[in-house]
């Protein structure tokens, strides 16, 4: 019979990272907030789906606010105080997520829109007929 392995303490140790970058990817269906340090190593992340929303509710501004709040709380536990924010996508939760990061106690130094815009690249999908 296999012996149970012993668990050795918490796997994630607390770091002291004062500045970082928050990437907010906001689509029509979901909002994903990822907070990384200046090197690019991810410190915390949250999405509307991981925050407990399902289906069409994931695309709402309130779901984006909850996701940003969860990610910010975990980043503050790691010692984060200042953020640069990179916003990507056309979703409804863009501004709400930025406001939630500010409301959680993080100081935002820069907001940049990094939504990829094609210079007439790939053909878009056909229009929906409802």
From Swiss-Prot:
Q: What is this protein called?
A: Small ribosomal subunit protein uS11
Q: Which family does it belong to?
A: Belongs to the universal ribosomal protein uS11 family.
Q: Name one GO biological process term.
A: translation
The beginning of the lineage is:
Bacteria, Bacillati, Cyanobacteriota, Cyanophyceae, Oscillatoriophycideae
Which Pfam families did the record assign?
A: Ribosomal_S11
So what does this one do? Answer: Located on the platform of the 30S subunit, it bridges several disparate RNA helices of the 16S rRNA. Forms part of the Shine-Dalgarno cleft in the 70S ribosome.
According to the lineage, what is the superkingdom? Bacteria
| One Gene Ontology term of the molecular function aspect | rRNA binding
Query: What Gene Ontology terms describe where this protein resides (cellular component)?
Result: ribonucleoprotein complex; ribosome
User: Subunit notes for this chain?
Assistant: Part of the 30S ribosomal subunit. Interacts with proteins S7 and S18. Binds to IF-3.
Query: What InterPro entries does the database record attribute to this sequence?
Result: Ribosomal_uS11, Ribosomal_uS11_bac-type, Ribosomal_uS11_CS, Ribosomal_uS11_sf
SUPFAM superfamilies documented for this protein: Translational machinery components (SSF53137)
């Amino acid at each position: 019979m296999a012996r149970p392995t012993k668990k050795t303490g918490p796997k994630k140790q607390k770091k002291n990272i004062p500045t970082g970058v928050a990437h907010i990817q906001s689509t029509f269906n979901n909002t994903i907030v990822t907070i990384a340090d200046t090197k690019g190593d991810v410190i915390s992340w949250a999405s509307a789906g991981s925050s407990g929303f399902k289906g069409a509710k994931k695309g709402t501004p309130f779901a984006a606010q909850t996701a940003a709040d969860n990610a910010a709380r975990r980043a503050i536990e790691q010692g984060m105080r200042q953020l640069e924010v990179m916003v990507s996508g056309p979703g409804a939760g863009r501004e709400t997520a930025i406001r939630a990061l500010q409301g959680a106690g993080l100081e935002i130094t820069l907001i940049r829109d990094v939504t990829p815009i094609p210079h007439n690249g790939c053909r878009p999908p056909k229009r929906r007929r409802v």
